[in-house]
Amino acid sequence: MEKEELNKLNHLSLVSNVCNELETHLGSAEKVLAEFIIDLGRHSETVDEFDKNLKEAGAEMPDYFVRSLLTTIHGIYPPKPKSEKKKEEGDDQKFKGLAIKDTKDKVKELEKEIEREAEERRREEDRNRDRDRRESGRDRDRDRNRDRDDRRDRHRDRERNRGDEEGEDRRSDRRHRERGRGDGGEGEDRRRDRRAKDEYVEEDKGGANEPELYQVYKGRVTRVMDAGCFVQFDKFRGKEGLVHVSQMATRRVDKAKEFVKRDMEVYVKVISISSDKYSLSMRDVDQNTGRDLIPLRKPSDEDDSSRSNPSYRTKDGQVTKTGISGIRIVEENDVAPSRRPLKKMSSPERWEAKQLIASGVLRVDEFPMYDEDGDGMLYQEEGAEEELEIEMNEDEPAFLQGQTRYSVDMSPVKIFKNPEGSLSRAAALQSALTKERREMREQQQRTMLDSIPKDLNRPWEDPMPETGERHLAQELRGVGLSAYDMPEWKKDAFGKTPTFGQRSKLSIQEQRESLPIYKLKKELIQAVHDNQVLVVIGETGSGKTTQVTQYLAEAGYTTKGKIGCTQPRRVAAMSVAKRVAEEFGCRLGEEVGYAIRFEDCTGPDTVIKYMTDGMLLREILIDENLSQYSVIMLDEAHERTIHTDVLFGLLKKLMKRRLDLRLIVTSATLDAEKFSGYFFNCNIFTIPGRTFPVEILYTKQPETDYLDAALITVLQIHLTEPEGDILVFLTGQEEIDSACQSLYERMKGLGKNVPELIILPVYSALPSEMQSRIFDPPPPGKRKVVVATNIAEASLTIDGIYYVVDPGFAKQNVYNPKQGLESLVITPISQASAKQRAGRAGRTGPGKCYRLYTESAYRNEMPPTSIPEIQRINLGMTTLTMKAMGINDLLSFDFMDPPQPQALISAMEQLYSLGALDEEGLLTKLGRKMAEFPLEPPLSKMLLASVDLGCSDEILTMIAMIQTGNIFYRPREKQAQADQKRAKFFQPEGDHLTLLAVYEAWKAKNFSGPWCFENFIQSRSLRRAQDVRKQLLSIMDKYKLDVVTAGKNFTKIRKAITAGFFFHGARKDPQEGYRTLVENQPVYIHPSSALFQRQPDWVIYHDLVMTTKEYMREVTVIDPKWLVELAPRFFKVSDPTKMSKRKRQERIEPLYDRYHEPNSWRLSKRRA
């Protein structure tokens, strides 16, 4: 009966929502119409089917509105599920691209081929190095000969001045002899070598009197600069060209002066001719023999060989060749264009310009398109860019026919158990309240800055200032000068001497013996010996992570190999390894070490290795049998990260091949049965925790503003409950900072008679010395409140917590395969997480947990366990890694919780567009190289494309800077000054080049820490970027990939970015902001971007961040032609004879009188 009533309420709620949507979009909200649409939606499985049914019923609606309606309807009435058997059969037939046969042999052949290529490049590099040494030796000989000739000339002059004829005859004879000796001194070998060189130099065909494109000529260096050198042709008197520093050698040359010097003889190749300017290359020519290393010829118009040759000429006459990244490289002039190309003006723009000129607002000669030689009218520049219309290339690859987004409806992951429940409404409301609070803070900041007097010198100039005026001016002068001026609550929390970890009076051995696991040491070792796979369950703080590895090392398991322990977080792997090294009695990096992405702190003696789960996955990629290890321990398995889930499947297979390998799976929650059932029904080893009873308290009514409710609860506990510390769970840094500020102000408002409350935040961006404060016990008579993210659920153990405040929310990364976007969404936690949070209050003594939601919401709106990461995030990196292991049959892979087939198809579609997969869905050579880099596939492609485009040095820096996160520090009290400092680094090309400018400026200041402090830049982030860059550089060196600089040619850099992130393209919307090219989604440039004031027509962004709007992060200006040029599988030029899809969806705003209402021009509809 209750279920029927609940269904009726859900139906009424759905009808109300549909009516509201219809009112908003169509201006009509009839209940009967809403009921009819809901019925159509209940019987439609896909968006296309729903759209078809609506059209048959006579309803024409926009695509986005149809999709929104169906999502709302399916939230209450999901499509009827088919039986499991039919579903599996259907998946095999429907998603054939996921059931390709495994090809491990082909992948191994690819690896050998890549190694052979690297070895060939290594040998070539050695040959070039030897040749450079020989050439430098010849240069020294040539200089010595020139000096000797100069001395002889001076000697001749002295003899000539004597003036006797006899001496003249003798001198004449001597000159002949000396000339003979000089010739002999040069040597017959030298002459033979010179003749051999000349054989390779192209002879003058038809008596050409000017240098020709792609021909090799001998020349002499006339002028040397840092950025390059000028070379004069020996053959053409008075003709010279520029050799840019990037074209001097295959290796990196920082300054031209280090490689060439004046009057040095060189061989050059003409790579570009512009008017009378010649761009030359030395690296394409063997300087020892004059041979062209990369021969390119000028094909005739009738030549059809471009189809079969790797290098060919495009329609506009540019020669291209295919690089290692699969893109066509256009041979361009290295000199940056002198000005931006003009965009073709539309008719309204020309009319507007003429009106401005006619009215006298704009001077005609200042207008860029003014015709000086003509009649003074505006002209359209020849060759001005036509407006390019680009659309998606909907051609599906053979292995994905009928499976991509163009054929199958890809719905987003359902993360809310009940989308209409109280928790869902509270999550949505909190996002709006956060936006409101942020805007209020910004308004207060602006008001404060506006109140500062503009002329602060007046009080000193005034001989009789008002009382206190000079003092006020002195204070105002200091506003904005201190870079890291913390708010009051942070000063109280962290302003004193920092501490570095939890202090204990016990010795290390006594601390180890006090852990609950110590009593079960013998039983645990025996259980590992008797079971190949063992699931270990124990509360956080029981000693699983730090002690199990040491017990096994003491039991002799390190004699057969290493003991590896994975952690889901980088920080955990580092801190745990440091602690275990102290207990083990060694230095970190010796017997005990750790490995995280871009950092390896291990050595040849390492026997206990802590690492992130992603690092172990990369080790399996190299050695599928993990032959170095005797024991693998998957710690914190209950967090179910994407790497852990893939490791489950790979290790399950490996256990059958390696019977000597031991696998331990640990978890802090009570979902052990699921793990045990997955791993061959293995035994479960339980460590009893030292927990006390916890009283659970629910709210009687749902809380709309959970943040405010949490603060009220904290104050209530502080004022009415016995002593004991408080732990509050919130969703992120912004929420935590806002809560701490508000709580501090409320405590100040209560007066000095109230006991002090120490407020301590915890989130990942906080420095470690500040995080460690939470472990210190508060002074007598005081209480501390720790405001933390869900990192305090299981990863941290804080003693002294008696009270837990749980609003019931966390932020989760959710991927939408239809839009191809990831976003951080506030979602209700699972019941397992709620139990875990409550358990934090029972570590020291009996405690209380205040759940800020109803018991009904706990039972009906929270899922039993969290949705695994593999079912809600982008699977591009995971799919590429599995393909690199030869695993193509992803449907049959033994996942504990299989991901959505649509998400896997979306990932494979992305990899195909990047060139990592071929037409059959198998890994390409480019894909295997991409898998070598510990980067997301787009970043890997961007790096490999930069090698071809000749800008890998800059792209390495950019990727390293992006990987470290936000490098700019913007304190709330000094936002204006921080923004001003940041603006100094802005580049007109975009944010990627701004990051490059920051790193180069830091490098120019010798990596100075004080310089970072002055410019509001986080020095820790820059040092991290430096380490990341070194790691990527070592991988580049391993495969002998060229690291070259593009100098000032930013076009190459922007092209490389486009080659990796073409699907993150956006175009300026005529009405407001931008529209993404893939889903036509409205997005905006963030106010902190270098391009915020410029608003270019076409951009590429790194990712999207949802705050008050959907903002693009790290934005760069692009040319739309590059999208088709660099991603022909993804984009194509629209058919000029047809109206494009974008133009069909574009809304045209009619002109209207600005002094009246926009719709006042419309005629009223006549009534019949």
UniProtKB/Swiss-Prot annotation:
**Region feature Disordered, mapped onto this chain:** 76-206, 289-326
Q: Keyword annotations for this protein?
A: ATP-binding, Helicase, Hydrolase, mRNA processing, mRNA splicing, Nucleotide-binding, Nucleus, Phosphoprotein, Spliceosome
Where are the bilayer-spanning segments? none
Residues forming the S1 motif domain are: 214-283
Question: What lineage does UniProt assign to this protein's organism?
Answer: Eukaryota, Viridiplantae, Streptophyta, Embryophyta, Tracheophyta
For bias type Basic and acidic residues, the affected ranges are 81-172, 180-206
- One Gene Ontology term from the biological process aspect of the record: mRNA splicing, via spliceosome
- Primary enzyme class: hydrolase
Listed EC numbers: 3.6.4.13
Under Gene3D superfamilies, the record lists: 1.20.120.1080, Nucleic acid-binding proteins, P-loop containing nucleotide triphosphate hydrolases
- Residues annotated with Phosphoserine modification: 411
Q: Where in the cell is it found?
A: Nucleus
Q: What does this protein do?
A: May be involved in pre-mRNA splicing.
The entry's family comment says: Belongs to the DEAD box helicase family. DEAH subfamily. PRP22 sub-subfamily.
Q: Does the keyword Iron-sulfur apply?
A: no
Positions annotated to bind ATP: 538-545
What protein does this entry describe? Answer: Probable pre-mRNA-splicing factor ATP-dependent RNA helicase DEAH5
